């Protein structure tokens, strides 16, 4: 039963929605919330997490509606994506309809029309937004939100497991700024967090919010049967770089499976990691469906970030209504959007973490029925390892969430933003963590902050929130513009522009293919024109690295395993053209893009001459053995840290000028680090053991994309020595303590 303190009209509204009794975990969450305890519910997909926090929230809002101003209590809902916030507003409106005007939900994001925003600030009592809008609009404009913040009872943080790495670290500081302003207005909101099944969710939630958090993790909801298949695409007759065998692409396999399922009337979502992949799967499936039935292609579409608001909303409506049978989607749809009636989920490549894998698989069968989930392996070391070692997916707990709010590159701009919101005092510093006090003199020296009497003030005319992009991209977005018409097709982060919209890149939008004619980094514009090239493109880069500081190290025999600060210089130098469907390399074109410098954290290991002799590594094969070990270790790291292989980079050199030894580096791809390299350091033995095993188990002769070749290698995957890498890692691990 619901706690007695939940209003009877709220309980009646829940029953009117067809829910007679809560599950135990839902009642437990409500009890903690009513007691004023911040709580995280970390149960499976479709376990009713939303209702668990909505019951106390709606009860508080209905109580507050009886206050003289009609807004004695408010609640703030934070979602990582616009799609999830829009879906939650729909769900809240339906559930709270019997309560009349007591609950007034409203979305406040970049798509909200200007004329609606004032109404939201003054009258809405349940505001649904995202961390970006909180950072850029609500907190800097807190004076206009004073009545809302003064009454803030609950802050709901949905899908909190997604707040990891640099993005999670930024969100942690945004939430600390929110708590500081709430305290100024006399409020101390309770945090209600919802997470996918996670490792130690209470610790992760506490690190995110900065307050003690209780966890509810015992899932009492019934589950339909899910059949989970691991699918490895077949080898083709094609040969890749250095004559390596090539498998059929995961994209082509997914498109075929999506086609077959749609023909059978099976409602299916195919998750793919890239915008381009989502568009490509949609296009291929539509072409193949047209051969079967001309009415079917319109029932398949792509859904990804970067669409204009009206396009995104139309797709969401079509999916909810059942008008669409098949959807190729990026993670914009992964997160909690309630798509009732899905029968199957196709996952195109391992999504980077077990938490995301189960989150995506859980989208099917949400009405309690049985469902199908299929993981289609990409031709890379991690995916190949997983389809041959299913116990790594099904018998291991989900990963710990990695974030580092004390990262100075993250913390410094938020101290400036906080000072701009209201002057920063000594008493505030504890809220922002132990690194805050040490950063203030640097911010004063940079003339960003000025100390007057007992507080630090923001000194500039520009907005302090413009100092950082909390998604970690950095810089202003690059606009993708159709040259012939001037039409804006979408945007891409500046950090991704070098690889995504370089000159000659293929860009897909809503099923149409465009070629990038010119990338203007100065004006942040990529000019494109519609075309139909028979290929896709993949950027390649080169990297150099120098050690700034070794923070900690441990001996592995005569070798050393180290962690510390490094400076990385990276340059996109060329791109490959690959044949559609087969992935066959058609050619490589040079690029002239400026190098970029990054100060970050890295893990690295060295080997000595004696160890090389013991592993039978001659000077002729040393570079190839190190290079192969570097590629494979980057590919396997997502099993041990909540990262994507594109979040990290690597460098290997037979003689590094700072270590004076053969050295392999793996570094975080974000300024100041993201916590991934540190996690790699602490799990190094298990991580490198899995790396060695993955290379050794691959059936290829001399290396292939499934083990040691990397799609982004700027050296053309040369040199690589598969057997040398296995011997080298075996020798290194035998000396590990």
Regions found by a protein language model. Give the residues of each.
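Extended Lys/Arg-rich polyanion-binding regions
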Residues: 370-373, 379-394, 404, 409, ...
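Cys/His-rich metal-chelating microdomains
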Residues: 710
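Juxtamembrane regulatory segments of integral membrane proteins
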Residues: 706, 715-716
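Short cysteine clusters
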Residues: 698, 703-707
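Helicase motor core with emphasis on the C-terminal RecA-like subdomain
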Residues: 1-17, 21-24, 28, 34-50, ...
